Amino acid sequence: MNQTKPSKKFWLAVVIYSLVGQVAWVMENMYLNVFIYKMFNASAEEISLMVSASSIAATVTTLLIGALSDKIGKRKLFICGGYLLWGVSIWSFALIRMDVINALFPAAVSASSVCVSLVIIMDCVMTFFGSSANDACFNAWLTDASDSSNRGAVEGINSMMPLMAILVVFGGFMSFDQNLPETWVMIFGIIGTLVLGIGVLGFFLIDEKPVKTQGNEKYFANIFYGFRPSVIGQNKLLYLALGAYAVFNISIQIYMPYLILYYTVSL
């Protein structure tokens, strides 16, 4: 088999987008729980609601936007535009503060309850943009831009970035006083700017790869194709692997979003 050697520009895009995307997800999946607890005294039920709502938003978004990207044959637009809006949505959390909400809603019975509700809503909005850009289209672009001779290396880099992102976020923000509102303004400002910046960079760094749109014209049929019993029966080993991977990831997601909160509050 002939080895296809991607360009240095491609590898740079893989590293940057994989890492920054996962940094944003670490903030959303792990630090947002700390934010809503420390700033607004959110209950365990409210934190669980936020985690569940964002998980559903991520899953549905990936299916819908992934199918739409396949239908129109474009990845770059969704990646760059999604990262831009993802960065802006991260910035918006810096505005969810008690002093701001008290000024906007002076008659509110509980400003903290308003803040908790806004965080949950904006988490779903942020997840929509992030899943559109990263989960649905960036991962599809990786498949489009690689082949069987180099896909293992590409996916290897992409797969190690969640761990790298945890180290970056922990190392970067561990020394911050997370009991201060100003700290969270800084955290959201830094990550939002970083995500927005690579959204702009993508217009120059990402090369659009040809996407076969033939067979993807029927949008909803494309969405539900993978759920058909006949398709599952024809690809039993694939779905067995997907099922095992789903169980593994569900197990991780049961505790991982609460890990930092547990460390900071219980230990």
What feature does the model see in each segment?
Residues 1-8, 210-242:
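Juxtamembrane intracellular "pre-TM" segments in multi-pass secondary transporters
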Residues 2-57, 237-267:
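Helix-loop boundary and gating motifs at the non-cytosolic
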Residues 47-69, 88-89:
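Central cavity-lining transmembrane alpha-helices of secondary-active solute carriers
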Residues 54-59, 152-177:
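Glycine-rich segments within core transmembrane alpha-helices of 12-TM secondary carriers
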Residues 75, 109-110, 175-193:
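A membrane-interface helix-boundary motif in multi-pass transporters
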Residues 81-113:
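C-terminal ends and interior cores of transmembrane alpha-helices
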Residues 123-160:
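Cytoplasmic helix-loop-helix junction between adjacent transmembrane helices
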Residues 193-212:
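C-terminal membrane-cytosol helix-exit motif in multi-pass small-molecule transporters
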